[in-house]
Each structure stands twice: as structure tokens, then as C-alpha cells.
Design a protein with these regions (language model features):
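Nucleotidyltransferase catalytic cores
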Residues: 1-112, 200-204, 220-969
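Amphipathic alpha-helical scaffolding segments
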Residues: 151-161, 168-174, 363-364, 380-391
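Conserved structured core elements
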Residues: 69, 128, 147-148, 163-170, ...
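Flexible helix-coil linker/hinge segments at domain or subdomain boundaries
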Residues: 178-186
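Catalytic metal-binding acidic patch
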Residues: 135, 142-170, 186-191
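Short, conserved secondary-structure transition motifs
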Residues: 185-207
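Acidic, Ser/Thr-rich peripheral helices and adjacent loops at domain boundaries
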Residues: 208-216
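Well-ordered mid-protein domain cores that form the structural environment of catalytic cofactors
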Residues: 89-148
Length: 969
């Protein structure tokens, strides 16, 4: 127990020193509460813990600079007094007074060296001492202490402090943090209210490696086995044997009630009897999350979490083992080192599971964490105690010098070493995730938060280590600080199977040398290899690349430009991905399109045919031959999950296929948050024009296909490519010629689908004038008269196209039959439409247009014409058709001026009979064409609704059959 006087403190330290020297011969202590406990036994136990703490503090000081040592030494005094001349001063009323503490002359002398005018005045009487304890947490004093290890300080305070006092105490801690930084120490002070802590309530993180309030018991375990006592009360947990942990509270109550210990001498932070399974999930998630960026430190801790979780519910944590060793008199400080104890537990766990590869990785993690390069001589003549301890471990592991050299050279590891290590790390990350997932499911330990975190972590792991088609593998998951090579050789040639590929070699090799070396990487295409080099930092701005392009057509200038574009479009390091982003589906963030890599679509012959007037300057239909200058596209896409994916498109469909996939990756109805798009082409001839055309096309297609059911028409040479946004995909249809295009545009689809044209599509074609005029719920009739023939086109209510060529002697005779038919369609439609308009259908509107001028000339135009007055409603010879489903085929019934002609009566002679009747009704037997004036297909469709284009097609077939029969008579 801390004594109020410096002389008593010195006596404590002297006793601790004697005990430290006699650690190996300390007898075991097994107090039994019911048999009574000698206070001397409790004093001995306390002295053992204090001796270990003092020994760790001494070792911690050895690893600190003189100024850093000063910061640690003065902390008890700085929390004991408020003095304007000392660091951390806020006000005279700031809570101060470290329980049971009085500074000795050496400490006061240290304070006066800091501030000469400072004089210490002992407090008289029994003043309040609201600072109950100061403890250093973490790796200080352990084998893993580094030169820049953080100082995590727990400031345990009186639970009675009010909000104002706590605020002043926090301000004091902030000032001390700044002061420690001026001495070269990164200090973090954490206020701990013991009463709230025991109840699992805390307001802030309690270590610089703390992930929140869900790890109460694991944090307490770490505190009890790593904390270094600086002053104040000592944990009452020290005085409760491990075999009494199950009745911790009653045991402590007895110690206090029987006055074996005084309440003002001890600090109660709780016990470690049982750790809830949810804590292992939370801790495992946190360590796994950090292991993706810094694997060695975090995987070691993750393995310890796995050890604990595997013991659930009877978890014998390391703090209890540490306490057992102290009671047993096993006080050798090296064996009680927190990291060594953790390693021993991990080693036993992995040996029991026959996992030698995982054990070797755990050893490498510990070795690299300790960071004492054993293949190199020590900095000083005398070896540090960490080095001596590590040398003993390495001898036990039977590591050879070559392995030590490789590990000590990690800062200079390049591709080959990183690839070798990445496999082991990726396997361990995957194993850790599966263990956590299985443990969560078996123990039903997942809260809604941990389920969400598991999902996020799974996606983060998937984005980092999982392989998939086109994805650039990330090698350097916190393994090496710099993988850039000084020089590389890039070769295009044949592989062992005789197939062409790109190979990357280290060093600057000539044609006679590279055959004798194994490449770092091979790929079929160039861009995946360059993207891999960039993403993994293998090539940076200072790397010299020797190029042997073979027959690829790649020049050194183009290679330089490609690498520069990758660096510009995808600057490294990539920004971290937050959890909210991982909860959503991965979306493209940056898209770089590289057109015609290593290709020049214009040879000298093509250059002679360059258009002079710009009429055929479109790269998708260039010159008189309408050449397509887009021969290949390499797409490099960075997703919102930081996945880099490379896709290649080549051949005549390269552009539409790339466009389809690009649009497929965009969310439907997306306006904001579209990925940044960059298009580059380094072809010698018209490279910039090609890139500009492709970029404009993609941006236009993005805009026009932003909503569901929208369509976009692109023409490449004489081929057409129609892209359509479906609810869950983008569909691309390639059409070889205009005939195929007309057939496709004439298909029924029962929902309005707007169609937008690329600015170069259908140039010189009437469709260029017609298609942009489409409107929903309209029947739009377009006609062009060419001498004695006319071309009719109809856009129906859903924007389906129907075309027909007819003889034309008179516009009225041309239009009236078709307009009568459309009126009957309109009538049937309007008869179905609810007066309230709540059935999803709208009434039709019929519009008439005439086309003028040559479609290839600027003078071409479309004129809106009024519907002919009268005519359509005048008396005429009615030919109505009703089509119904039959057992094997549809059944047609025709009505000629209300006289019925059915297949039941006439069979195969139906059309002949109707033709004869029609002919008999005409004056002088005139043989002009007959027309269907009304058609009902409602029985053929389950919905009862026929799209107009379907009616027009069936009408044309019936009319053809009737007119053929008429011609035979």
C-alpha cells in the first residue's frame, strides 16, 4: 500500500527491490479466506506486484530518451499539485492530490531542474486526494516497446468529482499532452471513474488502440497484465487469488469489512470471472479491420482473441495466468512479459491444432513487432534486454540466418518477397474472418451492430484480398513501405504455349538476358500489367522501364503516356473507404478508357482518303469507306470499395460492348454521383479526335439512359447498336443493317420507351427526322411521297415503329384507309380508358406529319399536318376482322359491311370468299386494293390490350392475303 511519507515510500521501494532480486526463490502463496489471512501475506503479495511494476518501469525508462524519462518521472507530482510554474496548470481549484503520495527529494530536484522557482509545500492535515491512481498502459516496459511507443496513462479519479472539476481535469490532461509532445513523447491521458468503470460505463476510449465500450473485460484484462503503477492506490484485484475470482465481490467485501486492507489504499476496477462472447466478436472485428492495413501487429492480437474465444465460456485470460504466477512465486520478469505470455498462449493453441504455418506467421508477427534486427549488430556495445530475449526465442524457433536477414530487410522488400508474404497474411485474414463468423453464429453473440460490422468487414476483406475476373490484385497489405523498382524490362513475346503475352522483369535486361529470368508477372494484355504495377507501386515516376515491344506497335512515348495517365487518374495512396460506403453496393468512382493501345487505325492508305470537307470525319464512320477508328478499348475502373478492375474490348463491337458495361455499372435513375470519366487515345493519327468522340458518346449515353426503359441508338459503320435501360440491367442489341433495325424498332413492348439518337446515327435517313419526334400515347403517322409511291411510317403509343411502302396516286386515297383504321384503334382504346384515368391508360392522340426535302440535305424537314376534315368519318366500305385463339391456330372472322365470313364456314377459302364479295360490291368490278378498317386482337392477349404496332402488322398480313385473293379473281 502507498504510504503518506517519502520515507515509507522509500522503504516500499527498497523492499520491492529486495523482492525483485529474490524473485526466483519466492515461495508460493495460497491464502484461504475462511482460515484467516495474515496482513503480512497481503503486504507480500502487494510487494510482489509492485516489484514487477517497478522492474517494468525501469525497463520502460531504458527505452526512453532523457527528456521522455523526465515526462514519466514528473507525472505523479504534476497530478499531485497545482502550481502555476509546472506544466499542466489550469487553476488552483483543478482536482489535485495523488492518493497516498509524497514526492521524494530526487523527484523534487527533477521538478526544480524543470522550473527553478518551484518549491514544494507539503499539505497539512488530511486534504482531499481525488486522484486515486496513475498507471501506464500498453507496450511500455515490454519486449515490444519501441522508440516511439505511446504513453497511455490512466488517471483514476474520485467518483464524486462534479462536471466542472472533470472539465478542468481534462484541460489539465490536454496541457500535459502538449507538454509531453514537446519532450518527444506522444502521451494520451484517459480519465477513469472506477465506480462507473465497474458498471461498464465509460465516456471515452481508454487506450490509443481502443475501439469502444464493447470490450470492457478484454480491456480490463489488458490493464491488469500490462499496467505499470506510477502512484496512488493499487488494484484490490491483486489481493484476490485467481481461484477466488468467481466470488470476487464477496471476497473484496470481506477484506474491507475485516480491515485486512483499507478502502483508501485500494482501487476496485472489477474482476475477470467471465467475458461475454460479444466482446470477442467486437475485439476480433477491430483487430481484423486494422490488420488489413497493418497486419503484423493486429494479426498477433487477433490470434489472442481467437485463443480466448476458443475457451469460451471458461476463458482463462492472460491476466489471471499472470496473477497465478505471482501468487506461485514465478516472478521471472521475462516470462511474465505481456507479449511473451500472449505468444506462449498462441503457440500452445496453434500446436494443439497442428497449424505450423499459422504458428510461423505468429512468430514473424512478434519478431517484426519487437523490431530488433538480429542479423545486424546491436547499436550499442551492450545488448538490450529485448534483443537478448528475442535471440533466445529465435533459437527456440530454430530460425536460420537467412530468414533473419530477410525479415530485417522488410523495409526494402519488393514484389517477390511481398507476394510470398501476402499469401500467408491473406490466408490468416480469411481464417480470422471465418472464425469470427462461425463463433458469432454458434454463440448467437451478434448484436445488430456486430452483424453490420461483420458485413462491412467481409466486404472490406473481399475488396482487399479476394480475386475475381479483371480485378487487379493488391499485394502490399501493409507489408512493405516501398515496392517501387529502380528499373524494369517490359517484353512482348510468346509464352511457353506460343501465345502472345506481356512479361515484366526486374532490372534492365537485353534480348539475350530475359530468357534466363523468371518474370515478375505475365498478362495477355498490356493494360492489366501496367495497372497492376501502378496499384502496387511497382512503377513510380522514378522507375526506368526498358521496352521490347515486338510486333505490338507500342512505342516508348505511348508507354510513358499510359503510365502518366494511370498516375493522374488514380493517384496513390487511395483514400480510405468508410463503413457506410461498404454497406452499399460497389459503384464505379473513376473510369479511365484507353483507346487503341498500341494500335493506329489509320495507315498511309487511309490517310490518302481523309475527308476534306469534314462530312465523314466521325471516327465511327470515317472517310468514304465509313471506317471505324475505335479498334480496342481498355477500361480501368476504380470502384467505391477501392477495387481496381480492368476490362478489354476489341473488334467491331468494342465500343458498344464497353458502353453497355459502363452503363450497366451505373445505378438506374442516377443523376448525381456519376463516376469521373477520362478517355485517352495515343494513336499517332487523330488520337485526340477519337478520344473526344468516345468521351462525348459515353457522357451523352449516360444522360439519355439515366431512366428505366430509355433507349439510345448508336451507328458504327453500317451497323446499328441499340442500348436500353432495363429495371435491372442494360441490354445491348446489335443490328447488321437498316432492315434489321426496322424489324427491331417494330417489336411490341407495351410500355413507352423513349429513343434517343447519337448525333451521327442515321445521317441521310428519314428515320433521323422521324424518331426524335416520338411522344407517349400518340399515334404519329409520317409520310413521304416519292413519285408514284409513298413511304408510310407510324410511331405508336409505346414508340414502336411500323413502316410500309404503298403506291400513291392521291394523298387523300393514300391516307384515308390508314387514318380510318387508326381511328378505330383510337375508338377501341378510348372505350377502355376509365373516365377517372386511374387504370394506367391514357386516351390516344393521332398526329399527321409530312416529310420534305432530301433527308441527306440540311433542307430536309418535317411538317405537322392537320388531319383531313371529313373523310375518316364518311361512309365507307367497312372490313372488320376479329381474331380469336383456337386449339391449334388463331381463328379469323371477317365482317364486310356487317356480313360475317368465318373460317368455320369457309375454311381455307375464307379470303377468296371475302374477295369475291368485295369485288361484287364495287362498280364495274374495280380492282383497287382493299383495306382492313377495324381489327380486334383482344382475345389473343391475356391483358386484353393490343399494341398498335401489333394491329398494324396483323392488318398488313390480312390485307396482303385479301389482295392476293383479289388478284386471282
Amino acid at each position: 500500500m502507498c504510504q503518506p511519507q517519502a520515507s515509507q515510500r522509500a522503504a516500499d521501494e527498497q523492499r520491492s527491490s529486495h523482492l525483485h532480486n529474490a524473485m526466483t526463490r519466492s515461495p508460493p502463496i495460497q491464502p484461504i479466506l475462511e482460515e484467516g489471512i495474515d496482513r503480512k501475506v497481503l503486504a507480500t503479495l502487494r510487494a510482489r506486484f509492485l516489484a514487477l511494476s517497478a522492474a517494468r518501469l525501469e525497463r520502460a525508462m531504458q527505452g526512453l530518451s532523457t527528456r521522455q524519462q523526465q515526462a514519466v518521472q514528473l507525472l505523479p507530482l504534476l497530478f499531485h499539485v497545482n502550481h502555476p510554474l509546472l506544466p499542466g496548470y489550469v487553476s488552483a481549484s483543478t482536482p489535485a492530490g495523488l492518493s497516498g503520495f509524497e514526492p521524494d527529494t530526487e523527484l523534487l530536484a527533477e521538478a526544480q531542474r524543470l522550473t527553478r522557482s518551484f518549491t514544494y509545500k507539503p499539505l497539512r492535515g488530511r486534504p482531499a486526494q481525488p486522484i486515486w491512481g496513475l498507471y501506464l498502459m500498453g507496450s511500455l516496459g515490454t519486449v515490444a516497446q519501441e522508440e516511439h511507443s505511446d504513453l497511455d496513462v490512466w488517471v483514476c479519479h474520485d467518483s464524486a468529482l462534479d462536471a466542472r472539476q472533470l472539465d478542468e481535469l481534462r484541460r489539465k490532461c490536454d496541457l500535459l499532452t502538449a507538454w509531453a509532445a514537446s519532450l518527444g513523447s506522444e502521451a494520451h491521458f484517459f480519465l477513469v471513474d472506477p465506480q462507473r468503470f465497474v458498471q461498464g460505463q465509460r465516456e471515452t476510449q481508454l487506450t490509443s488502440d481502443d475501439c469502444g465500450t464493447t470490450q470492457h473485460y478484454l480491456l480490463l484484462d489488458e490493464f491488469y497484465r500490462t499496467a505499470i503503477w506510477l502512484g496512488g492506490r493499487t488494484p484490490v484485484w491483486w489481493l484476490v487469488p485467481a481461484y477466488e475470482e468467481h466470488r470476487y465481490h464477496s471476497y473484496v467485501d470481506t477484506l474491507l469489512e475485516r480491515r485486512f486492507v483499507r478502502a483508501e489504499d485500494v482501487l476496485d476496477l472489477g474482476h475477470l470471472q467471465q467475458i461475454p462472447p460479444g466482446e470477442f466478436v467486437g475485439a476480433g472485428l477491430w483487430q481484423l479491420y486494422k490488420a488489413i492495413e497493418a497486419p503484423y501487429k493486429s494479426l498477433f492480437k487477433l490470434l489472442l482473441v481467437e485463443v480466448y474465444a476458443s475457451q469460451h465460456p471458461q476463458v482463462h485470460c492472460l491476466a489471471l495466468a499472470f496473477k497465478q504466477a505471482v501468487y506461485a512465486g514465478q516472478l521471472k520478469i521475462e516470462e511474465l512479459d505481456p507479449y511473451i505470455c500472449a505468444y506462449r498462449a498462441i503457440e500452445q493453441y496453434l500446436r494443439d491444432r497442428d497449424a505450423p504455418e499459422r504458428l510461423e506467421l505468429a512468430r514473424r508477427c512478434l519478431y517484426l513487432k519487437v523490431n530488433r534486427p538480429l542479423s545486424r549488430p546491436p547499436r550499442n556495445r551492450n545488448k538490450s534486454w529485448q534483443r537478448v530475449l528475442l535471440e533466445q526465442l529465435v533459437r527456440d524457433w530454430q530460425w536460420d540466418e537467412r530468414l533473419l536477414v530477410r525479415l530485417d530487410d522488410r523495409s526494402r522488400w519488393k514484389v517477390r518477397q511481398v507476394i510470398q508474404e501476402r499469401q500467408a497474411l491473406a490466408n490468416e485474414l480469411a481464417l480470422g474472418y471465418r472464425f469470427l463468423s462461425d463463433f458469432t453464429r454458434l454463440q448467437q453473440a451478434a448484436s445488430s451492430v456486430s452483424r453490420r460490422d461483420l458485413s462491412v468487414l467481409g466486404r472490406r476483406l473481399f475488396a482487399t484480398i479476394e480475386r475475381k475476373v479483371g480485378k487487379v490484385e493488391v499485394l502490399n497489405i501493409g507489408i512493405s513501405p516501398n515496392m517501387a523498382e529502380d528499373s524494369l524490362t517490359l517484353v512482348h513475346g510468346e509464352d511457353a504455349a506460343g501465345d502472345l503475352c506481356w512479361s515484366l522483369f526486374t532490372g534492365s535486361l537485353n534480348a539475350h538476358e530475359w530468357a534466363n529470368f523468371a518474370p515478375l508477372k505475365r498478362t495477355r494484355e498490356l493494360i492489366p500489367l501496367l495497372a497492376w504495377c501502378h496499384r502496387n507501386g511497382v512503377i513510380d515516376a522514378g522507375t526506368r522501364v526498358s521496352l521490347f515491344a515486338g510486333d505490338s506497335g507500342l512505342s516508348e512515348l505511348e508507354l510513358f503516356n499510359l503510365l502518366s495517365e494511370l498516375r493522374q487518374a488514380l493517384p496513390l495512396p487511395l483514400p480510405p473507404v468508410d463503413a457506410q460506403t461498404l454497406l452499399a453496393t460497389a459503384q464505379p468512382r473513376t473510369v479511365l478508357l484507353l483507346v487503341n493501345v498500341g494500335l493506329d487505325p489509320l495507315d498511309q492508305r487511309s490517310l490518302l482518303q481523309m475527308p476534306e470537307d469534314g462530312a465523314h470525319s466521325d471516327p465511327l464512320g470515317y472517310a468514304a469507306a465509313r471506317e471505324n477508328l475505335v479498334l480496342s478499348i481498355d477500361q480501368v475502373q476504380l470502384s467505391s470499395w477501392n477495387e481496381l478492375i480492368v476490362s478489354r474490348y476489341e473488334g467491331p463491337h468494342a465500343l458498344p460492348d464497353c458502353l453497355r458495361d459502363h452503363l450497366q455499372n451505373l445505378p438506374a435513375d442516377a443523376v448525381d454521383g456519376l463516376p469521373q470519366l477520362q478517355v485517352r487515345c495515343f494513336s499517332r493519327n487523330r488520337g485526340q479526335a477519337i478520344a473526344r468522340r468516345v468521351e462525348e458518346l459515353l457522357l451523352e449515353a449516360r444522360l439519355q439512359l439515366a431512366s428505366v426503359h430509355s433507349r439510345y441508338l448508336l451507328q458504327v459503320r453500317q451497323q446499328f447498336h441499340l442500348l436500353e435501360r432495363r429495371p435491372d440491367s442494360v441490354r445491348a442489341t446489335s443490328l447488321n443493317d437498316r432492315t434489321a433495325l426496322l424489324a427491331h424498332l417494330g417489336e411490341a413492348h407495351h410500355v413507352y420507351r423513349p429513343l434517343r439518337l447519337d448525333r451521327h446515327a442515321l445521317k441521310g435517313d428519314d428515320l433521323r427526322l422521324i424518331l426524335p419526334l416520338a411522344r407517349p400515347d400518340c399515334l404519329q403517322l409520317f409520310y413521304r411521297v416519292r413519285g408514284e409511291t409513298a413511304e408510310l411510317s407510324i410511331l405508336d403509343e409505346c414508340n414502336a415503329l411500323w413502316c410500309q411502302r404503298l403506291p400513291c396516286r392521291d394523298e387523300q386515297q393514300l391516307l384515308m384507309p390508314l387514318l380510318r383504321f387508326l381511328r378505330s384503334v383510337e375508338y377501341r382504346r378510348n372505350a377502355r380508358v376509365s373516365l377517372h384515368g386511374d387504370d394506367g391508360e391514357a386516351a390516344f392522340d393521332i398526329q399527321l406529319y409530312r416529310l420534305h426535302g432530301d433527308p441527306g440535305e440540311p433542307s430536309a424537314s418535317v411538317e405537322r399536318r392537320p388531319l383531313p376534315q371529313g373523310g375518316t368519318s364518311d361512309a365507307c366500305y367497312e372490313v372488320q376482322a376479329i381474331v380469336e385463339p383456337g386449339e391449334t391456330r388463331s381463328q379469323v372472322t371477317l365482317y364486310c359491311n356487317h356480313r360475317e365470313f368465318s373460317e368455320l364456314e369457309y375454311g381455307a377459302r375464307l379470303c377468296i370468299a371475302v374477295a369475291e364479295h368485295i369485288l361484287s360490291q364495287r362498280r364495274d368490278g374495280e380492282r383497287y386494293p382493299c383495306y382492313i378498317t377495324d381489327l380486334d386482337l383482344s382475345g389473343m392477349h391475356g391483358s386484353g390490350r393490343s399494341q398498335t404496332v401489333q394491329l398494324l402488322r396483323y392488318k398488313a398480313r390480312l390485307e396482303a392475303a385479301l389482295n392476293a385473293a383479289l388478284a386471282q379473281l
